[in-house]
A protein has these predicted regions:
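Glycine-rich Rossmann-fold phosphate-binding loop(s) that bind the pyrophosphate
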Residues: 154-155
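A conserved regulatory-domain signal marking ACT and ACT-like small-molecule sensing domains
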Residues: 315-397
């Protein structure tokens, strides 16, 4: 059953942080905000990697902002049903991840890791400088210039990776049937666009995956897709662990079909595999990235709490609105079903309310309506709106 809530406009908002959030981001909050240790009384939550799926979400909670791109740790459907808007910060960590992907390409092309480990193992050996000249050939590799790189997924990170690899002299192929206009404009014109991932599999020496984890993409790198690839291909995964089937990649590494698998998500299986370069989830772990993510997350929360503006939500439609100049603003999170606007306006007109401006946006099963009106919102008005079937949360600003 849907959980509904009536929320009056606040002048003081309570923020709960579930992980360490950059101070630079937290300083964006002004004197109208204070931090709380109690999740039950929070108006908004800032989170990075903490698992929220088993947490009890309080009736006060209006928003959750993930300081990062992935939201697998947040119960999106539950939040939508409770009228809690979930935000992410796409692109804020894109440069950090891009740089690590390029590093991963170089680590896979040349046995830098093996060479470093050899030095550590022999650092106390007498005459190591002469031994280096004798052994360095064991760690020889290849240059990436002139090699073919396939980028699957041309979002904020994928575009940066493709452009950077092109500048390094690689022949870059990109595939993304859902590329946005913004990202298409940002993509180098020298990147070769292909329509199917199969073309990438058959063509490229290096393949890097930058897609979200969902049913359609889970284990997309598997025995069948690997079978289409070149012998000695290098696969890079800086998106989500489950995009790659561990058992299939292990067999491909053992047979030599896959030369190296570079992953930012080591687990019990991949950490022990030969041929795997496992990085301990460092993709977004830079000071700059953490600052950028925190600032973006805080701004998203502030805009929603103070104006009702939604940007970069993952469970409700984006609906960017300016600060209202009317007497009041009513925001309604509701199911995306017929006649809802008619029902809202009927209630408002019964209280002799004049609607100065109306915005309605929808996304899948959910919708968001914003009414700027010429009178103060009363408890009775909120209650009447809340009683409409399909309404999830009513708020006045």
């Amino acid at each position: 059953m849907s959980i509904r809530k009536l929320v009056r406009g606040n002048t003081m908002y309570r923020i709960k942080t579930l992980n360490k959030i950059s101070d630079i981001g937290l300083k964006v909050f002004n004197e109208n905000y204070r931090f709380t240790e109690e999740l039950s009384e929070a108006d908004a939550v800032l989170v990075r990697s903490a698992d929220m799926k088993s947490l009890e979400l309080g009736d006060n909670l209006l928003a959750i902002a993930r300081a990062g791109a992935g939201v697998n740790n947040i119960p999106l459907d539950k939040c939508a049903e409770q009228g809690i808007v979930v935000f992410s910060t796409p692109g804020a960590n894109a440069n950090a991840v891009k740089e690590l992907v390029i590093a991963g390409l170089l680590l896979a092309a040349r046995d830098i890791v093996g060479g470093i480990n050899w030095v550590q193992d022999n650092k106390e050996t007498e005459g190591i400088s002469k031994l280096v000249e004798k052994e360095k050939g064991s760690f020889a590799g290849n240059e990436i210039e002139g090699k073919k790189l396939g980028v699957i997924g041309l979002g904020a990170i994928g575009v940066l990776v493709a452009n950077a690899a092109k500048r390094l002299g690689m022949e870059v192929y990109g595939c993304d049937p859902y590329i946005s206009v913004e990202h298409a404009w940002s993509l180098s014109r020298d990147v070769i666009h292909v329509k199917t991932v199969e073309e990438i599999y058959r063509t490229c020496d290096y393949i890097t995956v930058h897609v979200p984890l969902m049913d359609a993409t889970k284990h997309m790198i598997n025995a069948d897709s690997i079978g289409l690839m070149k012998d000695g291909v290098v696969i890079l995964n800086f998106s989500r662990d489950a995009l790659v089937n561990d058992e299939d990649i292990e067999k491909a590494l053992a047979s030599g079909k896959v030369k190296k698998y570079v992953t930012d998500f080591p687990n019990e299986k991949t950490a022990e595999m030969n041929g795997v370069i496992a990085i301990p989830h460092l993709g977004a772990s830079t000071e700059e990235s953490e600052d950028n993510c925190a600032v973006m997350a805080v701004k998203e929360v502030v805009d929603y709490l103070e104006k009702g503006s939604i940007k970069n939500s993952v469970n409700y439609p984006n609906c960017e609105v300016a600060k209202h100049t009317s007497v009041s603003r009513i925001t309604i999170l509701h199911k995306n079903i017929p006649s809802m606007i008619t029902k809202f306006t009927t209630v408002l007109s019964s209280y002799n309310v004049n609607i100065e401006e109306l915005v309605n946006k929808s996304r899948g099963d959910y919708a968001y309506s914003v009414f700027d009106i010429d009178t103060t919102v009363t408890d009775e008005m909120r209650k009447a709106l809340n009683e409409i079937e399909g309404v999830l949360k009513v708020r006045s600003i």
